[in-house]
A protein has these predicted regions:
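Short, cysteine/histidine-rich loop/knuckle motifs that typically chelate Zn2+
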Residues: 143
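Short Cys/His-rich local motifs and their 1-3 flanking residues in nucleic-acid-associated proteins
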Residues: 146
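Extracytoplasmic c-type cytochrome modules immediately beyond a signal peptide or single-pass transmembrane anchor
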Residues: 18-140, 149-183
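Hydrophobic h-region of N-terminal signal peptides that target proteins for export
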Residues: 10-18
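Sec-dependent signal peptide recognition
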Residues: 2-10
């Protein structure tokens, strides 16, 4: 809840301070910021996987992913978050509007359609949001988000760290969630 409040306050403050961006600038900024987040988080998780395996990566995520996301937001002057319908951390649960987009993208995948690289949406309140799909495209992702044996040390660590976890059972090419960048 605290993270949502901080996201909302930062979002409103950024709207009041910044000059309006053009659509092209929003696309460019959204692409840059989301790519930076994916790279920073991915590099950290890769290091954790190499040095301590999936459990180390899980602990890194639980302790650092939100603050790393906040750091990227602060550095970029945007509001950014990662969301999913099948979230691991309840803080990353998609809103009603975000679920609608994720469900639309799920339907596209089910019909063998290609997902857009991004979606730029103007909300009813006049604000614009950049959405970027997160697709499982690396075997390493499946170590923590694939089919996890119920009695494995990793499954136990996930359950201890995230009692409400819903983020397993994915396959290569599945939609994991999306990155949301607000302007």
């Amino acid at each position: 809840m605290k993270r949502l409040a901080v996201f909302s306050l930062f979002f409103i403050a950024s709207l009041l301070i910044a000059e309006p961006l053009t659509q092209e600038q929003m696309i460019q900024k959204g692409t840059e910021v989301s790519t930076t987040l994916v790279q920073k988080l991915g590099n950290e998780l890769k290091t954790q996987m190499q040095t301590g395996g999936p459990i180390a990566a899980l602990h890194f995520c639980s302790q650092n992913a939100l603050s790393l996301t906040d750091q990227v937001a602060k550095e970029s002057g945007t509001a950014i978050k990662r969301v999913s319908i099948q979230n691991r951390n309840p803080v990353n649960a998609a809103t009603f509007e975000e679920k609608a987009i994720l469900n639309q993208w799920q339907a596209m995948l089910k019909n063998s359609e290609t997902l857009p690289a991004y979606q730029l949406t103007k909300l009813s309140n006049g604000h614009t949001v950049y959405y970027k799909p997160i697709v499982i495209n690396k075997d390493a992702c499946l170590k923590c988000h694939g089919d996890i044996a119920g009695d494995s040390p990793l499954a136990k660590a996930i359950k201890e760290t995230y009692p409400e976890d819903q983020a397993t059972g994915y396959k290569m090419g599945d939609l994991r969630g999306m990155i949301v960048v607000a302007f």
